[in-house]
C-alpha cells in the first residue's frame, strides 16, 4: 500500500517518465502522442499540489508546479512580483538539491519549469 506522504515522490517519477516519452514523441514528430503526454504532464502537475513532499524529487516537482502557475499568472503580477516569485522558487529548488540526492537536471527542465 502506498503511504500518503510518498505520493509526491511517486508523481515526480511518473512525471519524469512521461516527459521523457514526450521528448521521444517530439523527436518522432508524433503530434497525437505529444498531445497525450502533455495532457498527462499537466494532470500530474495538478495532482502533485495535493500531496506533501517527502523527498527531494517530490519537492522539486511541487516547485515545478508552482513555477508553472506563476508563468500562467504573469499578466496578473507586477514585474517585481514575478521576478521575486521566480527567485524564491529557484532558491528553494537549490535548497532541496543541497539537502537531498535529487537534482533539477534529473528532470527535463523545460517541463519542470525551474
How would you name each of these model-derived features?
Residues 1-114:
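Sequence/structural signature of long amphipathic alpha-helices
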Amino acid at each position: 500500500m502506498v503511504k500518503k506522504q510518498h505520493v509526491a515522490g511517486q508523481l515526480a517519477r511518473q512525471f519524469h517518465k512521461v516527459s521523457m516519452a514526450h521528448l521521444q514523441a517530439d523527436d518522432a514528430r508524433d503530434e497525437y502522442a505529444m498531445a497525450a503526454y502533455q495532457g498527462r504532464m499537466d494532470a500530474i502537475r495538478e495532482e502533485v499540489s495535493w500531496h506533501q513532499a517527502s523527498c527531494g524529487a517530490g519537492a522539486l516537482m511541487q516547485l515545478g508546479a508552482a513555477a508553472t502557475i506563476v508563468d500562467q499568472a504573469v499578466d496578473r503580477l507586477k514585474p517585481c512580483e514575478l521576478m521575486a516569485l521566480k527567485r524564491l522558487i529557484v532558491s528553494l529548488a537549490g535548497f532541496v538539491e543541497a539537502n537531498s540526492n535529487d537534482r533539477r537536471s534529473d528532470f527535463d527542465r523545460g517541463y519542470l519549469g525551474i
